[in-house]
Structures are given as C-alpha cells and as structure tokens.
Regions:
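Conserved Class I S-adenosyl-L-methionine-dependent methyltransferase catalytic core
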Residues: 4-26, 30-37, 41-45, 51-124
C-alpha cells in the first residue's frame, strides 16, 4: 500500500544507493578491513575532503553499513560484521563486484530521464 513513508522512501532512496556505491568505488570497506580508522585517517588513505567525508561516514553509520565508536574528531569508524563479510574486496563472500561501476553505468542515464521524457531522446 502506498503511504507517506513509502513515498518518502522512494524519493530519497537514491541517497542510500549513492552512499553505498561511492563507498564501494572508493574502497572504504576494504580500507576499514585493515582495522578501525578515524575520519582523518580515512580521508588520508582514500584521498577525501574531511569536510565532506564526515557527514558521508555518519550517513553510512545511520544506515547500518558502518559502526562508530566515540564522537567528534576522535570518533573511530569500523565495518559492521556484515559489511566486513560482504563489502570488503578481500572477503571470499564479497558481493560488491555486482555493484562496482553501477553509478557510472546506470545513474548517468537516470539523471537525464526528465529531459528524455520531454524531448524523446533515449537516456536509459
């Protein structure tokens, strides 16, 4: 049944997807497979902006992909048990290969959907 919650979930679903896909592309889960890291350590290792990375990391925590121990600059991030099992490239159970590059291959076409619907040019 369609509800306000379902409508909001559908409208905001891309955020969770993009957060996960970017984490896979950047190798976040594999980096955390080496051990817990602060946001600053992750930024150095992955070449990220500290200003942009902290909300992204906290978003991954709120969605259950990561855990955080502590708060502020001293907070430590680590993979959840499931993320370590399924999203670390070094794991035999890695499923991220199915998703790698998806943002580039698929989302680019979806971004042009409204233009395509208006002018008839293919986007997908």
């Amino acid at each position: 049944m369609l509800s306000p919650e379902r409508i909001l979930q559908a409208g905001l679903g891309f955020r969770e997807s993009q957060m996960l896909l970017s984490a896979l592309e950047l190798g976040l889960f594999t980096e955390l497979g080496k051990g817990p890291r602060t946001a600053q350590q992750l930024c150095r290792a992955l070449g990220l902006s500290a200003q942009a990375a902290s909300p992204w990391l906290d978003g991954l925590v709120s969605r259950g992909f990561l855990e955080r121990d502590g708060a502020g600059d001293g907070a430590i991030y680590l993979n959840t048990r499931e993320a370590a099992h399924f999203l670390d490239r070094k794991s035999a159970a890695y499923v991220g290969a199915e998703l790698e590059g998806l943002g580039e291959r698929v989302y680019a076409g979806w971004e042009a959907l409204i233009r395509s619907l208006q002018d008839g040019a293919p986007s997908l």
